[in-house]
Amino acid sequence: MNREQIKEKYLSSAILYRLLEKKREKLITIISVLRFFTFFGGLILAWIGFTFSVTDGVILILLFTVLFLWLLKFYSKHFEKREFISNLASINQNEADALSGDLKAFDAGNSYSDIRHDFSFDVDLFGTSSLFQYLNRTVTDYGRDILASWLSDPFILSKDLLPRQKAIKELASKDKWRHKYMASGMKTPLEKNEISSLLNWMQERALFSSSALNKILILSLPALAIVSLVLAITGVLPYPVFVFIFLGNLLYIAGGLKKINNIHNALSRKYKFLSSIDRLLKAFENESFNSPLLNDVKLNISGDDISAAGSVRKLGRLLQAFDTRNNQIIGLVLNGMLLWDYQSIMRLEKWKSDYKRMFPVWLNMIGQVDAFISLGNYVYNNPDFVFPVESENYEVFSAKNLGHQLIDERKRVCNDFSLGKKGTVCIISGANMAGKSTFLRTVAVNYILAMTGAPVCASEMNFIPGKLFTSMRTMDSLSSNESYFYAELRRLFILKSRIESGEPVFFILDEILKGTNSADKSKGSLLFLEKIVEKGGTGLIATHDTSLGKMESDHPGTVINKCFEIEIDGENIRFDYKIQEGITQKMNAVFLMNQMGILD
């Protein structure tokens, strides 16, 4: 399928799911009406039954209670199903919109933006209409963080590249499963701040870890209360004995109430988030995979005969049971009879003892799967993109029909480009608006994706993994009293230091030393590039300064010239955005100023 056919598939799926959602909504309405009549009809019939006999009334109450509870469960089941179908409809509609260039449904990752980062700010990695927003389909904070880290620190070892590519390819082929996973996570988005108190509790010392007496009392006192109640009902013991034991249990609870409340405050109402974790783990556990990397993740989730989903589900049930204390009357009765708070905490601490080391691992695995799904979705939506290959002839970067993912394919101009071996510097000259900066970002974005294990916008690409470093959009800083020019010098110093340290740096620079006069800028740029070439630096630099082009003859085989040319025909100017060999011969600043009437 091509992108247009994929878009049509998304739209038809969205329509189908909306129809299914409406059908489910009608069924839910019918169930709601039945619940209403069951409740009030049961009350009326029970009242009539009691006029005949107590037994008839009790039987009718029990029958209608069972029917009402069954309808309630039936309602909850179909309500969740309707919500799931609604999520699937939204997913397909959002993907269709994304293929039309509308990315507003997806988080842009603004919180990850960092102007001091090696490259993310320069290449629009995060923010509105960024690469992150283009890729991001995560439904958990953990997945969002992992995807952001893969993109902002993408250097990958050779041995890890192919396994990751295989995992992404496999997930691309599982479009229905990907949507099921995403829809499962959309019900209650898994947020780190909601889970943090749960993780903190798991690291705390157990309340009863060193008290055998407490454990004995917690098991024996409820038994004593139950036995005394039975004996009181049968007339063997007077009721005051039971009341005395009941109140004694409440006093015992009161003695540890502060600790109990602290634990409950940390864990209360976390069930819905655990339910979300359970659904995501279950979706992954129940799917079969071929790629070794995904199977390694699966082993971390459900290895050693442990079901992560089942274990999390058990924790959720324990927390639900603990939350019954929120109803003061029920909590009072349960604590007086069964020491319910202590019983709940003991069961929770048993779970903590068994799984506290695994739970953070499960969360991390959920995040990895979430991030992989985003990249799998990217592959599915772009069938013409290719997976890059690690270079076997030592070329740092070479590509055919290289383009930028975020430019509409109808307007995208692609280029063939080869940098050469390590130690090569490419000087790209050209007029204003000729396409230099866009090309630099095109190289950077595809290099990032290549090292992430994802496909690139090209028909063919070879590369050597390295550490990307850019200086393209330097910002001044009022808060740190740092001027624009000083900020740029600081980045150039960092680049030089990285190269000298032996890091495999791949640099991309755009018009350096912009904050000084032309002669000073030209001299400074030349001296800086001479130093970079001397140190064996590898990368690209775009410039308007054609005098830098002479470095090619001074360093044959090490420095190469490329350019973007323009055509000026009378009052018209034409940009073809195609990279060429050599140094640009045409500039357009005065022409553009005249066109805009600035010089009139």
Give residue spans per PLM region.
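ATPase nucleotide-binding head domains, primarily ABC-like/P-loop NTPase cores
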Residues: 375-600
